Amino acid sequence: MSKIPLGKKKRNKAPQATKQRTSNYAAETRLIYGQPFTPVWDYSHHVVPPLSSSATFRLDSTKRGAKGFVEFAHTAEDFQVHSKAPIYIYDRLGEPNKEILEENLAIAEQGECAATFTTGMAAISALCGVLLGSGSEIVAHHVLYGCTYSLFTNWFPRYKIKVTWVDFNDAKALERAISPHTKLLYFETPVNPTMEIIDIQKIVAVARKHNAQRSKVHRMYTAVDNTFATPFCQRPLEFGVDFVVESLTKGICGFGTDMGGVIIGPRWSYDPIVLYRKDFGGVLPAKSAWPILVYGLPSLAVRFRQQIETTKKVAEFLENDKHIQLVRYPGLESFEQQTLAKKQMRNYSDEFSPGTVLYFVPKGKTPEERHRKAEKMVNFIATKSYTITLAVSLGNIRTLIEHPASMTHSSISTEEQLRRGIDPGGIRLSIGLEKPEDIIHDLKKALGKIL
């Protein structure tokens, strides 16, 4: 885990001077260069960091090896050693590719530190593992990604962690759900898959109000899954959130080649999160960190600018099609939460950036009819479309379509889906870099044949 731009571990003097020199450069430029002259790794003047290919590292002496192990001591209280540069011992403890990536991710989200993991779910699990214990309670928004829902409902009860589900846009319901044992307010925005927007500042204000009456040890934290937006479109830490989690597999990687996850948060969280990762696993391999570092993050801004423009055109087409009952995309004037979206979803140039994912529902009088039509449409696209691929994931350079009710959110029962606002006929569409006319052509073909 890296603590750039700030951190507890003392590195050499280059990062401090570099931070001062780069502060006047655009954030999009810093996605490419990150932290130049990083002390994490002297890679002999390569313009592009090479792929680190070793699982273990040669040590010059037992003394140096001992010092390295002290830095990764067994308790957080012991983990207070200061050094000028990392001592790499073993990939699970630290490795240069992922540490450089962590520096750059912290810059991208404008956070104090970042820790990468094998997947987004590994990052979510680690954050909860660090913040929560037996008897802790989570209050979560009632619609979440299906695997997060599964983690909260199937696994946390085994550890005596209670989860209360509530609509985070209902202020009174949220207040009623909070108890003295609540340690975490957890939500996504935009919400997967419904594209609902949660007011980040209001949730932060609720947490701060309660924390004013609590001791430090009983503090309640806020965490946002920012996967749909990516740091290009939204940076929740700027609104006062404690932690951001993201799946690197999605928009940040962008090419659908590598999995990863990240926690970005305050400086003090460095020690416990890295120690948790050391003991529980979930370390991001160098072979996955490297492509995200050299291809994914540097190209995020240019990819998303184009993909957002295409998403707007596709959303407008669907909104005007007679076969479609509902389209939810923050970039549409008809989107009921657009004022809030415009406040939160701003790119590095302070332009409204509503993302690359939309949600739509085919017309049907009953949930069953809409479900049937959605499955038919998606199945037609799976075999007949050139520009749209039936696949989970999102943020890819290729346009991806999926049916949440039977795929990503199938861990939630049909009855619960309806209660939580997930339409059985809802279709999630993640727009890629194809020409908008080609995507629309394939959608027209599917709508004409099936609906």
Where are the predicted features?
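N-terminal glycine-rich, Lys/His-bearing helix-loop that initiates the first secondary-structure elements
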Residues: 1-81
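PLP-dependent enzyme catalytic core of the Aspartate aminotransferase-like
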Residues: 2-15, 112, 135, 153-154, ...
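Conserved PLP-enzyme active-site core in the AAT-like
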Residues: 5-23, 28, 35-42, 113-323, ...
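Active-site C-terminal subdomain of aminotransferase-like
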Residues: 33-37, 60, 65-66, 71-87, ...
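Conserved N-terminal alpha-helix of the aminotransferase class I/II PLP-enzyme fold
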Residues: 50-51, 56-122, 147-154
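Short, flexible, solvent-exposed loop/turn segments with mixed acidic/basic and small polar residues
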Residues: 129-130, 154, 338-351, 415-422
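Residue-level signature of catalytic and energy-coupling elements of molecular machines
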Residues: 188, 377, 429
